[in-house]
Amino acid sequence: MKYKRIVFKVGTSSLTNEDGSLSRSKVKDITQQLAMLHEAGHELILVSSGAIAAGFGALGFKKRPTKIADKQASAAVGQGLLLEEYTTNLLLRQIVSAQILLTQDDFVDKRRYKNAHQALSVLLNRGAIPIINENDSVVIDELKVGDNDTLSAQVAAMVQADLLVFLTDVDGLYTGNPNSDPRAKRLERIETINREIIDMAGGAGSSNGTGGMLTKIKAATIATESGVPVYICSSLKSDSMIEAAEETEDGSYFVAQEKGLRTQKQWLAFYAQSQGSIWVDKGAAEALSQYGKSLLLSGIVEAEGVFSYGDIVTVFDKESGKSLGKGRVQFGASALEDMLRSQKAKGVLIYRDDWISITPEIQLLFTEF
C-alpha cells in the first residue's frame, strides 16, 4: 500500500446542491468511499467544509448568507448537523468518527499544536476517522478564502500523511481557466511550486465555496515542503476518492520534497510568530543559508524588537535586506544589546537545530497576490 495515511479535503461545492444547501446524497457517497478505504487498511482524516451549508436553512435563510455573523450562526447550527450525517453513515459500517474543530491558534501555540498532534495520533491508531473543520462559529479571519484548504495541508503535515487529496469541482491545475479558455491544459505532474505555478492558479478554480485554486496551491506548498505529496482532482465521479488513493483518477499531482520538514521545523517555518528582527553580516548570512551553521554573536550587526530567551526572531541579511529565516534565540533583547555593545560578543544566538531557512517556495506563502 503506497498511501497508508491519507488526508482528504472536501470543499463546499462537493457537498452541496445547486441552491447551496447540503446534499445528503453527496455526503453519503463520500462516507461510503471512506468506509471502503478504511476497510482496505488506510488511515484516514477528512477535512470537511459544509457547516454553513448544512445550517443556514435551519435558521430560516433562503440562501447562503454573506455577513460574518450570519455565517457564524449558520456554522454553529450546521456543524452538528453535518457531523451527524457523517457519523450516521459511517456507523452503518461499524466505523467510529471523531469531530475536531481547529483554529489557527492551535497551530501557532506550540503546546496546543503538540496536543492536537497527540489526539489525532491516538484516533488514527485506534481506527477512528477524524472529521476536521475550522471552528467557523468563533473565528473571524479564518472565514476568509482558503481556510480549510490551508487547514487540510497543516493537518497533513502535522500527522506526516502519505498523501493529501483535494476534492473539488475542477479536475486539477490548468494553464488557464478551463471554463473560459479552450486552450487551457491540465498539468498532470508539478515538481516545484514556483511563481509561474502560482500565476496559473490565479485564473482557475471554483466560485461556490470559500476556497479557490490559488489557495489550494499555496496549501500544497505547506504539504509538499513537509514531505506530503498532494493530489487535486474532481469530486464528480462516484469513486473519485478511491481512484485518488490508487492513483487512477485524473488530476494534478504535486511532488513532495524528498527531505520534508519534520514537526519542529514545520512549526518554525509556518506558524511561529516572530518577536524581533536580527540583521547579520555577509559571513553570517552565508554560514546560515549555505553551510548549515549556527548563528554566532560575532556575525550580528544589529537587533530590533522586544524578545526574551526562547522567543522566535526573523534574521535578515544586512547587505541585501533579504529574509534568511527564523530561529529560537538563546538570549533576550536586553542581554543581546549589552553583548553587542561590548564589541567582544562570543557565543551562539541561534543553534542550527532551532533554525529554519526560508526557501523561495516557503516565501511564496507569505506573498500577497
Swiss-Prot record:
Keywords: Amino-acid biosynthesis, ATP-binding, Cytoplasm, Kinase, Nucleotide-binding, Proline biosynthesis, Transferase. ATP binds at K9, T168, D169, T210, G211, G212, M213, L214, T215, K216. It is an enzyme of class 2 (transferase). One of its GO terms (biological process) is L-proline biosynthetic process. The gene is proB. It holds the Pfam family AA_kinase. This is Glutamate 5-kinase. One of its GO terms (cellular component) is cytosol. The keyword Nucleotide-binding applies. Its EC number is 2.7.2.11. One of its GO terms (molecular function) is glutamate 5-kinase activity. Pathway: Amino-acid biosynthesis; L-proline biosynthesis; L-glutamate 5-semialdehyde from L-glutamate: step 1/2. Substrate binds at S49, D136, N148. It is found in: Cytoplasm. InterPro entries: AceGlu_kinase-like_sf, Asp/Glu/Uridylate_kinase, G5K_ProB, Glu/AcGlu_kinase, Glu_5kinase, Glu_5kinase/COase_Synthase, Glutamate_5-kinase_CS, PUA. PANTHER family: GLUTAMATE 5-KINASE, ISOPENTENYL PHOSPHATE KINASE. Residues 275-355 form the PUA domain. Catalyzes the transfer of a phosphate group to glutamate to form L-glutamate 5-phosphate. It comes from the Bacteria. It catalyses: L-glutamate + ATP = L-glutamyl 5-phosphate + ADP. Its main location: cytoplasm.
